[in-house]
Amino acid sequence: MNIQALLSDKVSQALIAAGAPAGSEPQVRQSAKAQFGDYQANGVMAIAKKLGMQPRQLAEKVIELLDLDGIASKVEIAGPGFINIFLDRQWVASKVEEALKAPKLGVQPVEPQTIVVDYSAPNVAKQMHVGHLRSTIIGDAAVRTLEFLGHNVIRANHVGDWGTQFGMLIAYLEKMQNENASDMGLSDLELFYQQAKKTYDEDEEFAKRARAYVVKLQSGDEYCRQMWRKLVDITMAQNQIAYDRLNVTLTKDDVMGESLYNTMLPEIVADLKAKGLAVESEGATVVYLDEYKNKDGEPMGVIIQKKDGGYLYTTTDIACAKYRYETLGADRVLYYIDSRQHQHLMQAWTIVRKAGYVPESVPLEHHMFGMMLGKDGKPFKTRSGGTVKLSDLLDEAIERAGKLIAEKNPDMPADELKQVVEAVGIGAVKYADLSKSRTTDYIFDWDNMLALDGNTAPYMQYAYTRVVSVFKRAGIDESNLTLPLVITEDREAALATRLLQFEEIITTVAREGTPHVMCSYLYDLAGLFSSFYEHCQILNADSEESRQSRLKLAMLTAKTLKQGLDTLGIQTVERM
């Protein structure tokens, strides 16, 4: 359940009854400190100012009219007009019981939307590197969260599968008399790419042939299309290995590469011209946007077709947005693309809106993210200054986690050890990223991410094993817990209330695309359980009623930690 939404509704009704205009924002928030209750309504002061009243006077009137019978044990005014709400422990206990029995921890179903999520987007004929990590795992966390809430999510892997590089690769493969591209691994393709680029730069005849192959490919030449398809298939097969290792839900069926929109591009250019949005300028086709100014203060020109007839990324992104609305039926589109692309996307979407391709009622959201940096504060590189391949990074994560887990569990069977090591190693890399606000750069640090304390995956995974170990020791499951839940201790109440805030957290993550909010919540929850575990006897409680109540709190904690980590794409283990 969403306590914040429930209290907001109740406070809003009281505000209106007290004379506030409809739609007044009650600003109900979770309290930062227990002394201020479980929730605070902070909107009274701003509303009182509009009404020409003293804030405390309005707050008193609101409390008088506020119907929280059975929900709150106490409501009080603090400071100049804050309203502190203390939840009734019996009510909290009953809601924990409901959450334990309900599907999805009691999270209410939403009105489902069709939401397109654009993420990962590696290039064909190149191995994935650390630069692809953030888009891939943040986007996948968004997808998992939205699907958990009941939305129809369409994954869109906008791979770079078109352009002059394919002319070079096809020409070079032919030059090497190696048409059997399906036998090559991606490492061979990378080398081919480098050699093709070198030859393209140094050999004008080769460059002409490569450009000719681009034209042939674009005009549908069968041989070129076959070779292109092989290059795409080899790349995506290799990328799938990375996705599977990362526990990311993308498959080959989610590939919607740049080539998908090729047939739309001439139509879009013609349509933008017909609508008077695009004009000819020095042989190119340009859209001038008043919203953006060049260095001379004039409307900025955005090229959508070059002199030679070629199209640009902007043209593709216009087509892409149009396709996602008209063909996929999107109610909302999220783009997990790094912050350096922000202006480019904004310009493309400005054109999309002006042309009427996507109505304003359908949000196009750039969920941008910062860079992964090394300890020196510079972009994360190998020791020699090269790009870090994603596969190498994951290999190292597993190797480091292996040493950590084997040291602590010398007798763990090999099969179990392998599973635990992979979950901890991959989880550590993902959680280190997801636990940081996506809009900022973050420092990649092996020691921090594999630490068994602090806001890390190993700590969270260990916290989960600690909870489930209670049930293993007791030899019981949920069906044995038949007595009603009672809350008598402050630490029980704090844990129970935090457990009931899961829906508020997951709703925020879904709305804002901020998985670090989920990480912070889970870390807080693990800390509250640790305090509860240390100060409240569970298996040796004073009474059977208290024992079962505490086991129920432990049970909901385990379920919430597991579900929360699952929305992040991080696996739990039964022991560490």
Curated annotation (Swiss-Prot):
GO terms for molecular function: arginine-tRNA ligase activity; ATP binding. Coiled coil: none annotated. One of its GO terms (cellular component) is cytoplasm. Keywords: Aminoacyl-tRNA synthetase, ATP-binding, Cytoplasm, Ligase, Nucleotide-binding, Protein biosynthesis. It catalyses: tRNA(Arg) + L-arginine + ATP = L-arginyl-tRNA(Arg) + AMP + diphosphate. Transmembrane segments: none annotated. PROSITE patterns: AA_TRNA_LIGASE_I. InterPro entries: aa-tRNA-synth_I_CS, Arg-tRNA-ligase, Arg-tRNA-synth_N, Arg-tRNA-synth_N_sf, ArgRS_core, DALR_anticod-bd, Rossmann-like_a/b/a_fold, tRNAsynth_Ia_anticodon-bd. Its EC number is 6.1.1.19. It is found in: Cytoplasm. SUPFAM superfamilies: Anticodon-binding domain of a subclass of class I aminoacyl-tRNA synthetases, Arginyl-tRNA synthetase (ArgRS), N-terminal 'additional' domain, Nucleotidylyl transferase. Monomer. This is Arginine--tRNA ligase. It comes from Yersinia enterocolitica serotype O:8 / biotype 1B (strain NCTC 13174 / 8081). The lineage of its organism: Bacteria, Pseudomonadati, Pseudomonadota, Gammaproteobacteria, Enterobacterales.
